[in-house]
Amino acid sequence: YVFGSSFGFILGSSSLLFSALISGGFGPWLPFQMIAIGLVGFGAGALPQIRTPRLLLIPYAVLASFTFGALMTMWNWPYLAGLGSSVSFVPGAGVAENLIRFIRFEIATGGLIWDLGRAVTTSALIGVTATTLLATLKRAANRAVVEKLTNRN
């Protein structure tokens, strides 16, 4: 939010990469996590700067939590649901039909419950810490010296 879209995407993606390096959390899900959380950071950086940022950041946190959860479920949904069930991905079917199947899969696996927990926790933390944290980040942004890279040939 404070440092912009590009920084948000890079920070989100790289933080998951370094987290995986430290914790050994490498797997086929890592690139999807990096892209999904990078998009969350990108979206936060694209939000307009307003006088009361909590009013904007809390709804964004709810939307981003459910979007992140859906993106993370999408990467493995065709494999976990199998073939031929009412929740499985059907190649060649329309978007609406597969979307209905995906929503059924999310409900059946409890994915929406995890997303709801993520949304509530994130919103509560933003509600409690936003004022102090944003003031600190804005102060750091004002004190930082950042220059654009240019080709000096």
Residue ranges and their predicted role:
Residues 12-48, 53:
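Interfacial aromatic-anchored transmembrane helix boundaries in multi-pass membrane proteins
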